[in-house]
């Protein structure tokens, strides 16, 4: 089966989070149309995501060998988790990230997660001559779902969407060339504004799915 890796980065319960509400609607609809996909989920506020430290590494983006390195049990478990997250990321076909817009970017746990999954000999290759992504070995695509309280004018999206732009740049460097966005703009201050923004985003879901290369498109 193909794998859809669903990554959320919001501490709110799903029903209170617009990004997670639309994320759930998206993956449910996608799997309805593409039942050959299985879903794996990572909640960056609930799951253990190590904060990278020098003790985890033996070289540039290269974690230590747990079998030979002189490290304590806690560090060994952290290194194993870093490798596990990176391997899980490598094994996926479709990635869906659901995140709110915070301070022109995204919540900090997403950056810590990205740092974990970008590892030498798993998702990138690091040599003295070059650093290159390794995820161009098969068809992979990403959908970035972002909620924001206000409407972001088209002309200023490059200024205010620094988080989205950063994620797109990193994924393309890794080898994930097709990047789709689903914006939940204008969630506002009232429950009515929130529901209206979510309804508008739900209407966009099928069009995003149609652009995904390996989708059955309904």
Curated annotation (Swiss-Prot):
Catalytic reactions on record: 2 a quinone + NADH + H(+) = 2 a 1,4-benzosemiquinone + NAD(+); N,N-dimethyl-1,4-phenylenediamine + anthranilate + 2 NAD(+) = 2-(4-dimethylaminophenyl)diazenylbenzoate + 2 NADH + 2 H(+)
Keywords: Flavoprotein, FMN, NAD, Oxidoreductase
Cofactor note: Binds 1 FMN per subunit.
Classification via Gene3D superfamilies: 3.40.50.360
Cofactor: FMN
Functional summary from the UniProt entry: Quinone reductase that provides resistance to thiol-specific stress caused by electrophilic quinones.
UniProt-recorded name of the protein: FMN-dependent NADH:quinone oxidoreductase 1
Species assigned in the record: Clostridium perfringens (strain 13 / Type A)
Upper classification of the organism: Bacteria, Bacillati, Bacillota, Clostridia, Eubacteriales
Gene name for this UniProt entry: azoR1
């Amino acid at each position: 089966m193909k794998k859809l890796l669903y990554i959320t980065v919001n501490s709110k319960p799903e029903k209170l989070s617009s990004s997670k509400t639309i994320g759930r609607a998206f993956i449910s609809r996608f799997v309805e149309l593409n039942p050959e996909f299985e879903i794996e989920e990572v909640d960056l506020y609930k799951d253990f995501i190590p904060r990278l430290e020098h003790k985890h590494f033996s070289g540039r983006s290269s974690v230590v060998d747990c079998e030979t390195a002189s490290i304590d049990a806690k560090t060994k478990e952290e290194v194993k988790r870093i490798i596990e997250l990176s391997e899980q990321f490598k094994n996926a076909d479709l990635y869906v990230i659901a995140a709110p817009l915070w301070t022109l970017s995204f919540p900090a746990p997403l950056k810590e997660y990205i740092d974990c999954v970008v590892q030498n000999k798993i998702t990138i290759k690091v040599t003295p001559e070059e650093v290159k992504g390794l995820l161009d070995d098969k068809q992979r695509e990403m959908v970035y779902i972002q909620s924001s309280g206000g409407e972001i004018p088209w002309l200023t999206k490059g200024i205010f969407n620094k988080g989205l732009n950063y994620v797109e740049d990193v994924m393309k460097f890794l080898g994930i060339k097709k990047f789709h966005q689903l914006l939940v703009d204008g969630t506002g201050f009232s429950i009515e504004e929130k529901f209206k923004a979510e309804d508008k985003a739900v209407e966009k879901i099928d069009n995003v799915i149609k652009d995904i290369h390996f989708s059955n498109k309904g």
